């Protein structure tokens, strides 16, 4: 029988739950990467410049990111088998892992975070080592398409799949389904596109309004969009749901959407 625990009765040294606010501790790390005119806009990459301002970039560019983080901890608290393994794929600076560690005690789970950026990995190791010294967390550099996955109770893809070539996404989801234990949960957060061109254009404009309200100029918005054009290729929600069902998931729900950003949860039958 699966052992589930009401973790709120445990006391342990917790990291700050609002991981983004904690990571963004120095105003000098404001995202200004695209604030000057560029003769040539290179493809977006998670290099040292991006890592330095990443928390601010995420907070001002991804609607609802903080709410998603908070719910990930609650989803894990509700559905994760005690002692199970967790994967944080595309872990960046470790915000998802911090959110889980803020809800679950050190003996409740083990976790592997994977990221392709060596700079992200180094920073995440430093952050999590300081904030979660008692949790069993391993951050590794690697490509999620080629990880040798061990059985896991929960897998999180938080705005990660969208950066893979579209033709590789189905195989990744199939491998993650195979790695999940019966009753395991996959959380998939993605930027999305609407199938109706007019509706999608309206949503994109409101997203640009969101960024303007958060201090980005029209030039920054335009140059960032150009940088991401061939790097981040979004899918429709229907395409995501179809892919998840075809991989074997029978329960798939979109539990969160803010403008053209959404998060889905998929369960493997027990």
UniProtKB/Swiss-Prot annotation:
UniProt cross-references to HAMAP family, sorted A to Z: Cx_SAM_synthase (MF_01589)
Taxonomic placement: Bacteria, Pseudomonadati, Pseudomonadota, Gammaproteobacteria, Oceanospirillales
Name recorded for this polypeptide: Carboxy-S-adenosyl-L-methionine synthase
Catalytic activity: prephenate + S-adenosyl-L-methionine = carboxy-S-adenosyl-L-methionine + 3-phenylpyruvate + H2O
Gene3D superfamilies named among the record's database cross-references: Vaccinia Virus protein VP39
Function: Catalyzes the conversion of S-adenosyl-L-methionine (SAM) to carboxy-S-adenosyl-L-methionine (Cx-SAM).
Pfam families: Methyltransf_25
GO BP terms: tRNA wobble uridine modification
Protein family: Belongs to the class I-like SAM-binding methyltransferase superfamily. Cx-SAM synthase family.
SUPFAM superfamilies on file: S-adenosyl-L-methionine-dependent methyltransferases (SSF53335)
Molecular function as annotated in GO: carboxyl- or carbamoyltransferase activity; S-adenosyl-L-methionine binding
Gene (UniProt): cmoA
Organism: Chromohalobacter salexigens (strain ATCC BAA-138 / DSM 3043 / CIP 106854 / NCIMB 13768 / 1H11)
Enzyme nomenclature, EC number: 2.1.3.-
InterPro entries to which the protein is assigned, alphabetical: CmoA (IPR005271), Methyltransf_25 (IPR041698), SAM-dependent_MTases_sf (IPR029063)
NCBIfam families xref list: carboxy-S-adenosyl-L-methionine synthase CmoA
Coiled-coil annotated spans: none
Assembly behavior: Homodimer.
Protein residues bound to S-adenosyl-L-methionine: 65, 90-92, 143-144, 158, 225
This protein's UniProt keywords: S-adenosyl-L-methionine, Transferase
């Amino acid at each position: 029988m699966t052992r589930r625990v009401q973790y709120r009765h445990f006391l342990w040294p917790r990291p700050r739950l609002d991981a983004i606010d904690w990571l963004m501790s120095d105003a000098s790390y404001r995202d200004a990467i695209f604030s000057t005119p560029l003769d040539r806009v290179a493809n977006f990459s998670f290099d040292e410049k991006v890592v330095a301002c990443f928390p601010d970039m995420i907070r001002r560019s991804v609607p609802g990111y903080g709410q998603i983080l908070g719910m990930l901890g609650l989803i894990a608290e509700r559905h994760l088998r005690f002692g199970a393994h967790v994967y944080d794929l595309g872990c960046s600076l470790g915000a998802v892992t911090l959110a889980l560690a803020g809800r679950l005690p050190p003996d409740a789970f083990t976790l592997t975070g994977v990221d392709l950026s060596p700079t992200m990995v180094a920073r995440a190791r430093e952050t999590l080592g300081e904030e979660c010294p008692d949790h069993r967390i391993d951050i590794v550099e690697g490509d999620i398409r080629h990880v040798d996955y061990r059985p896991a109770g929960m897998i999180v893809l938080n705005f990660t799949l969208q950066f893979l070539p579209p033709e590789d996404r189905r195989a990744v989801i199939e491998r993650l389904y195979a790695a999940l234990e019966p009753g395991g949960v996959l959380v998939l957060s993605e930027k999305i596109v609407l199938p109706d061109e007019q509706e999608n254009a309206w949503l994109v404009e409101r997203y640009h309004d969101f960024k303007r309200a958060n201090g980005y100029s029209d030039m920054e918005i335009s140059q960032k969009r150009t940088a991401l054009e061939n790097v981040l290729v979004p899918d429709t929600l229907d395409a995501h749901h179809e892919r998840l069902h075809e991989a074997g998931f029978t329960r798939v729900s979109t539990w969160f959407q803010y403008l053209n950003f959404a998060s889905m949860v998929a369960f493997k039958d027990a």
